[in-house]
Regions:
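Acidic, PIN/NYN-like endoribonuclease modules and their adjacent C-terminal/linker elements
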Residues: 1-2, 98, 103-128
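Histidine- and aromatic-rich ligand-binding microenvironments
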Residues: 7-8, 14, 38-39, 90-91, ...
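Alpha-helix capping/helix-boundary segments
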Residues: 11-12, 42, 77, 96-97, ...
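Short, flexible helix/strand-to-coil boundary loops that buttress conserved ligand/catalytic motifs
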Residues: 16-17, 50, 85, 120, ...
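Nucleotide phosphate-binding site architecture
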Residues: 12-13, 44-47, 117, 125
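Generic structural signal for small/hydrophobic residues in well-ordered secondary structure
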Residues: 8-9, 46, 81, 101, ...
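Active-site neighborhoods of divalent-metal-dependent phosphate/nucleic-acid chemistry enzymes
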Residues: 70-111
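Short, well-structured N-terminal submotif of metal-dependent ribonuclease cores
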Residues: 1-38, 48-62
Length: 128
């Protein structure tokens, strides 16, 4: 496994839910054995969860997000995500996350491999 990834939202959700393989992966990121980015879309998706209303959950989420370099949607990512959405018929958030991996020249780490693997321009890997 390469050591530089864009991390998909579902992996972070797994971590927040206490799923051990996801917690182990986040520990590797925290220990700087893996370099990981998230898209600003991932942050938005995480903060849209119903459990985020609780202050403790919001604090845990902010701490988790602080482990990553957040990649903000820019013109290049926006245009590439539009191309991915058009060419591969995927949802806009997924297209933006895929375009972020393309922009950073790294693999996309996701549990949702079936939706992303059709995008020929990026490498997709399942974490567990």
């Amino acid at each position: 496994m390469s050591n530089v990834f864009v991390i998909d939202t579902y992996i972070l959700i797994d971590h927040l839910r206490g799923f051990e393989p996801a917690k182990f992966l986040i520990k590797k990121i925290r220990d700087e054995k893996i370099t990981a980015y998230i898209s600003s879309v991932t942050e938005a998706e995480l903060f849209s969860g119903k459990d985020i209303k609780l202050e403790n959950n919001r604090r845990n989420l902010k701490e988790l997000i602080s482990l990553f370099e957040k990649i903000i949607l820019n013109n290049e990512i926006a245009q590439k995500s539009g191309e991915f959405r058009r060419n591969y018929n995927i949802e806009t958030p997924d297209a933006i996350i895929a375009a972020t991996a393309f922009h950073k020249h790294c693999k996309l780490l996701t549990k949702n491999k079936k939706d992303f693997q059709k995008i020929k321009e990026i490498e997709v890997e399942e974490p567990y």
